[in-house]
């Protein structure tokens, strides 16, 4: 199932990246999400994992706010686009191709926050994902 989902997003990666580029160039959209992340995350720098990062919109904003971000996506082509966007927007974000359900590369209690915008519906086993996400959060961490 993971492979089918990955293939679909790989096929649609160009269109999805075009949409994200429009969002990143729209000051109102960037301002809205910047305010929302400030409100949700607070002023202290956090270790954040973005699951299903796509071309990197939320990771770019979180990194601009001073957070230490790792972004993962299941599509190799999307990961390439996210890396390009990080360079284009001068952000230091670790980006990896990784299964967002099993998180095979993540250690227990590693993150303060897990972000996921528009990706939960694509998970092939959401219950398993949420259990795993909880395991990689530090005590008191938030999804």
Where are the predicted features?
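Conserved class I S-adenosyl-L-methionine
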Residues: 1-43
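Class I SAM-dependent methyltransferase SAM/SAH-binding core
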Residues: 49, 55-102
């Amino acid at each position: 199932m993971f492979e089918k989902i990955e293939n679909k997003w790989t096929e649609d990666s160009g269109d999805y990246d075009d949409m994200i580029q429009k969002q990143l160039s729209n000051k109102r959209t960037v301002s809205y999400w910047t305010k929302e992340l400030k409100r949700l995350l607070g002023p202290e720098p956090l270790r954040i994992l973005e699951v299903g990062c796509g071309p990197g919109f939320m990771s770019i904003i979180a990194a601009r706010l001073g957070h230490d971000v790792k972004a993962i996506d299941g599509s190799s082509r999307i990961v390439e686009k996210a890396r390009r966007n990080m360079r284009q927007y001068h952000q230091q974000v670790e980006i990896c191709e990784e299964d967002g359900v099993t998180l095979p590369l993540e250690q227990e209690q590693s993150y303060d926050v897990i972000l996921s915008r528009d990706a939960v519906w694509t998970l092939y086993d959401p219950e398993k994902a949420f259990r795993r996400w909880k395991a990689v959060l530090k005590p008191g961490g938030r999804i």
